[in-house]
Amino acid sequence: MTEKSPKPHKRSDAITEGPNRAPARAMLRAAGFTPEDLRKPIIGIANTWIEIGPCNLHLRELAEHIKQGVREAGGTPMEFNTVSISDGITMGSEGMKASLVSREVIADSIELVARGNLFDGLIALSGCDKTIPGTIMALERLDIPGLMLYGGSIAPGKFHAQKVTIQDVFEAVGTHARGKMSDADLEELEHNACPGAGACGGQFTANTMSMCGEFLGISPMGANSVPAMTVEKQQVARRCGHLVMELVRRDIRPSQIITRKAIENAIASVAASGGSTNAVLHLLAIAHEMDVELNIEDFDKISSRTPLLCELKPAGRFTATDLHDAGGIPLVAQRLLEANLLHADALTVTGKTIAEEAKQAKETPGQEVVRPLTDPIKATGGLMILKGNLASEGCVVKLVGHKKLFFEGPARVFESEEEAFAGVEDRTIQAGEVVVVRYEGPKGGPGMREMLGVTAAIAGTELAETVALITDGRFSGATRGLSVGHVAPEAANGGAIAVVRNGDIITLDVERRELRVHLTDAELEARLRNWRAPEPRYKRGVFAKYASTVSSASFGAVTGSTIENKTLAGSTK
């Protein structure tokens, strides 16, 4: 450094340094921080802890291990909390409308606290579904050195000597409703499915997005697949405390990590693992935060060239803890690297490339969770994008857990998830029908609820292989069966799904990438001319605010975006 060079400073110096900051230091001393603490880099610890449900229950304890690591590496941690909604608990209720909305609130609130306190670095601790993309989006906006650590998966439960997850409980509801399961068995399953803390145990949304975190490079490779309630997870948390200090010293920022290449790597991981369709929504939003050009067709292109390698629930035999035992997420990365399906030079938070990290993977001899490239489950991945007169902006179908590539039948229309669930229970839905659930999109719901209650109830009946379901809402990562979600434009903005009637013939043709209702253009236009937007379900509060600002699902259902107004909520009017 020359004599004329400015003195190096930390972002947090604007809060803690100089005589005029004495009032701020006085308040920080009252909170227990010493003058020595305030001279060190200040690292925000964004926690999504709640005691409502198992997914985030252990994060308060895990945060202590992170803070220990930060202190050991010469930093001062400052922990704060944000919100979290348990998808598994709210599923099938009005409360589920809060889930996707919470992604934006999580990102907004972390951004506010970090900007307000001028942290030098940030670790975001996530668990349940929306906390993962929400924390990543906050890191992108802030663009300060930081990383996301996932709290880890729950251990599998046991029922009649079989491994079970929460998916089995949801499906048991349909089995029980049809008289094929006793009250006693349902209660026993309920008591044993979730043995402790950790996120839902299959390749559902949380584990899909935690894998994406590692493939994006914003989580250390191998950290997220470590199960929740293990000493190893505590050790990982402590190492992350060390790592964030190294990121601060080297000034490695999310904008250097989350690039187009990194996002394409993450999409490949979803395809190879049979991951949740929610990844489409979240990765579009993550791309948006970094101004990376990405559209839903990119998911189809990448999935089409990526083999399905992981036999994970909901369609396979294995749970997330089995994946860890087999070699974890690094093993999946190693397979895709060997197939030349990754951008090998993408940077990660360790300072190494994803190729350098993947080469360190250790495969457990005899494991069956991650297939060799010579013996994939399928030659192509689990996601496809369909378009047609029923979804001009596109929709998403997951090709895992069923073999049907073509379905045609009369529509059975429901105006909400509750109506559709009642249709399963009272046997209104008949074999051969296409179940249409509308006004559940980002604006119409609002909040784009997941339809797991409906799909799981169907899966627990004899209808499982004989109906298809389409919706402008979403599906849980635990969904299996022929289900098409994210239909856009959505019904609330006059998308074609709004004017489908009972008995209309709908064709779902996966190979042709088509979703079509058998109406001429003139017939469809005539119906749309007579369509009137329904009254908003909420006229004040967070849901009303969200509905007025959210974009179409085809753009990631983002809010406060720079996307042109014509794309907001998929409006065609």
From Swiss-Prot:
GO MF terms, alphabetically ordered: 2 iron, 2 sulfur cluster binding; dihydroxy-acid dehydratase activity; magnesium ion binding
Alphabetized InterPro entries for the sequence: DHAD_IlvD/Edd, Dihydro-acid_dehy_C, DihydroxyA_deHydtase, DiOHA_6PGluconate_deHydtase_CS, ILV_EDD_C, ILV_EDD_N, IlvD/EDD_N
Cofactor: [2Fe-2S] cluster; Mg(2+)
Keyword Amino-acid biosynthesis recorded: yes
Entry binding sites for Mg(2+): 87, 129-130, 450
Enzyme Commission code(s) on record: 4.2.1.9
First-tier enzyme category under EC: lyase
GO BP terms in the entry: isoleucine biosynthetic process; L-valine biosynthetic process
UniProt keyword terms in alphabetical order: 2Fe-2S, Amino-acid biosynthesis, Branched-chain amino acid biosynthesis, Iron, Iron-sulfur, Lyase, Magnesium, Metal-binding
Cited Pfam families: ILV_EDD_C, ILVD_EDD_N
Substrates-to-products reaction catalysed: (2R)-2,3-dihydroxy-3-methylbutanoate = 3-methyl-2-oxobutanoate + H2O; (2R,3R)-2,3-dihydroxy-3-methylpentanoate = (S)-3-methyl-2-oxopentanoate + H2O
Co-factor binding details: Binds 1 [2Fe-2S] cluster per subunit. This cluster acts as a Lewis acid cofactor.
Residues recorded with modification N6-carboxylysine: 130
Active site: 476 (proton acceptor)
Pathway(s) per entry: Amino-acid biosynthesis; L-isoleucine biosynthesis; L-isoleucine from 2-oxobutanoate: step 3/4; Amino-acid biosynthesis; L-valine biosynthesis; L-valine from pyruvate: step 3/4
Entry's family note: Belongs to the IlvD/Edd family.
Function description: Functions in the biosynthesis of branched-chain amino acids. Catalyzes the dehydration of (2R,3R)-2,3-dihydroxy-3-methylpentanoate (2,3-dihydroxy-3-methylvalerate) into 2-oxo-3-methylpentanoate (2-oxo-3-methylvalerate) and of (2R)-2,3-dihydroxy-3-methylbutanoate (2,3-dihydroxyisovalerate) into 2-oxo-3-methylbutanoate (2-oxoisovalerate), the penultimate precursor to L-isoleucine and L-valine, respectively.
Name of the featured protein: Dihydroxy-acid dehydratase
Lineage, highest ranks first: Bacteria, Pseudomonadati, Acidobacteriota, Terriglobia, Terriglobales
